Amino acid sequence: MKISQLFLGLVACSTAFAYAGIDGISSNESNIKIGAAANASHPGGVAAVSVQAAGAPYNAFTGFSSLKGLAQAFAAQGTSNTNVTVGSKTFNISHIPVSAMPPSHSALGNFNFGQVGTQEVYFGEWWKAGDTPASASHTVYYAGDNTNTTVPTAGTATYTVAGINGSASNLLSGTFTANYGAGTLEGTLTGTGTAVSSLSLDGVAFNPGTAAFAGLATANGTAGVDNSGVVQGQFFGANASALAGIAQFDNVSYNTAFGGAKN
């Protein structure tokens, strides 16, 4: 089914993927599932992820902060965990290629994900071992702690936003503007060295009561223009201090995860 045909359904169920204390979405829950409970051997933080595609016992929920530790522990083998400045904001970016993993962890596949500052808000991508970000297994996701989240109902604000699309070293970046009174979110991300060179939000609307947003997107890049995109995401924190979301396209190589901090 085409992504554009899914838009109304996604808007209708924009809160269907909420967990106790966590809001999050995966573009393909057969591959990646977002949750709030990490198992005892992989704790840390609140937001957690399960690699459903790996099967038992590798599909247990793992805290994102635990995955950050994995990215730090195997740096000599090719993983990385670094702080990146975008505008005036800091994002912590983790890169975990399957080629750097010991055999005991190879079933976990490939991870690129970011954290918005020090908040419990994450966004990223995954694909199977042996695949590429252009393959059908390319999955984007976000997860965040929704505790004490509030969204203003008047005024405007800008967000410095980073996007992940096929690379942890080449980020998309840009500014989103939220009009709290009108309930709209707009902006564009641009970058180089990724399948997507620009991604623009088109008619994205949000409900301050649920803090969720949804709408359409257009991307341009290595395969030309794709206007089939659907955006879904969430504000997090007091006065909507952060946001995260995903954009899905008919061309899965254009699928992008993003997160942002309020200026």
Curated annotation (Swiss-Prot):
Residues annotated as signal peptide: 1-20
InterPro entries reported for this sequence: HphA_C, HphA_N, OMP/PagP_b-brl, Slam_hemophilin_C
Example of a GO MF term: metal ion binding
Record localization: Secreted
Key words, A-Z: Heme, Iron, Metal-binding, Secreted, Signal, Virulence
Recorded GO CC terms: extracellular region
Domain of life: Bacteria
Induction note: Part of the hemO gene cluster.
Subunit structure comment from the entry: Monomer in solution. Interacts with host hemoglobin.
NCBIfam families: slam_lipo
The record's note on its domains: Contains an N-terminal clamp-like domain that binds heme and a C-terminal eight-stranded beta-barrel domain. The loop containing His-42 undergoes a large conformational change upon heme binding and release.
The protein's role, per its UniProt record: Part of a high affinity heme acquisition system. Functions as a hemophore that acquires heme from human hemoglobin and delivers the heme to its cognate receptor, HphR, facilitating transport of heme across the bacterial outer membrane. Apo HphA interacts specifically with human hemoglobin and steals heme through a passive process probably due to its high affinity for heme. It can also acquire heme complexed to human serum albumin. Plays a supporting role for full virulence, acting as an accessory factor that enhances the process of heme uptake.
Protein name as it appears in the record: Hemophilin
Species this protein is from: Acinetobacter baumannii
